[in-house]
């Protein structure tokens, strides 16, 4: 552009003179300023006028001066009000955003206003910097000590800064993208207006670069990194920049403080959470090891208690069957291996305990011992105590009476067989005596020999029968009754008992089976009879034989009640004793009936003739004999003397002493 052009159209002369520039030099600087700011319109708010850089040196000081003046925004507002009052009304309109109109493109109206505003800005900056210097020093000292929370104490200033920032964002959204950074360019243009043309021409390219750096506006962080707080040269250029950056840095400072406070609060919250977690974490770790430790102890204690209960239950359960076995003699394992002198009276009749009550007693005793696994030992002793207390006597009495009853019946049967054998022997002797008469001494010796032979033959038969039962595998083959005793006495009647009489009869095997099995059951009286083979004497069908057997049993019971009071009383007291007769064959029953009938006849004859009764001495010897042998055979053996033609007492008077001496000499005891 030609330098002869007058740039000061519409502008007073004193203003151009106050700038100290010649009319030739001023248009050059303004021309450059216009060329830089041709595309960028000015900001409408009053803060944008304070953000312009007058020179490159002042652009370097922007961030440091802004940091100094950010602590005193109130003073800046006061200074701004003073400048507004000092300006004339025509010039003050340029600072207000509401009254500021759109920029004019004519050179005559724009250039004088820019020069005037630049000079006024310099004066105001100098005044403000002189006022704010002591306050900036105080604020630096407080920052060096770490007094950061000043912004937290001034919430009103924060609100203002947030409002200003939001207003700027609104203005920036309204403008195009190319028009966003107008502040630094206008500031550079105004700075060039204030600089002489000779200096401006030399520093033009450098200022353009600095203007581009400062063009970041309020959103760029470069102005904060460029300056340092050590540069505090108090020049008019630096004073002129004091009022510009505070409003740019004001919205940022509170933001940084807010961020710092937010970070501090977050750290505090995180620390509290960590402390709470550290307090809560050891509790679940410490508690679980404490809780499971008593659990195995409880389990081990329960196991020990259960084992103790089982052992304590096993001991009384094993002891109770032993007690019951000794009291009631249940099986062969509780019986003695070697019988005493009279196994018939002591151990052979144990099968009589197989009655209904005797069968119920061991069941009652065995149930609590088997099922008492979960009960307490004290509960198991109570039934045993009750059983062994008042109920033991009746059971023992019944068992003893049944044994006594069986023994008497067997003795009666043995006597009947002996009588038959004697009758046969006497008949044979009579025949021989008729042919060859022999002395009486020889006859007696022959009778004794026949008796001995019969006894030994019975021994052989009994041993053979026992072997047969063992070979057949009967349930009672292992018992002591089925085995022959090791030592036999002279009297097979007392030693081997009923075996002698039954072995001669065809039903000996069946009778031994029933004796070994413990007698006939209570509910099946006909079982042993059906399993037993019939003799040829019985003849017809089993039904007739059963009817005849029942009739004979009734007749036998009636005769027993008449002949022997003790046996009759026992049958009346225990009707189940009648089942014992089912074990005998019909032949043996007939023998018993015949023997009892003969005894009835003898008793009736003795009642008629008192002379035939034995003297008291004979009864004394009989009682003595019965006491020593534990056999009451007085009434059963009275028929013995009738066949010889004299009474039983007379027979005893002649042979009692001789027979007793023979028995004592030949018996094992």
Swiss-Prot record:
Q: Where is the composition biased (Low complexity)?
A: 516-528
Indicate, by first and last residue, each region the UniProt record lists as having compositional bias (Basic residues): 158-175, 445-462
Q: Which UniProt keywords apply?
A: Isopeptide bond, Ubl conjugation
Comp. bias intervals (Basic and acidic residues): 34-47, 104-113, 131-148, 390-401
Pfam families in alphabetical order: CF222
Q: Which gene encodes it?
A: Bnip5
For the cross-link Glycyl lysine isopeptide (Lys-Gly) (interchain with G-Cter in SUMO2), the position is 314
Q: What is this protein called?
A: Protein BNIP5
Q: Which organism is it from?
A: Mus musculus
Query: Taxonomy-wise, where does this protein's organism fall, top ranks first?
Result: Eukaryota, Metazoa, Chordata, Craniata, Vertebrata
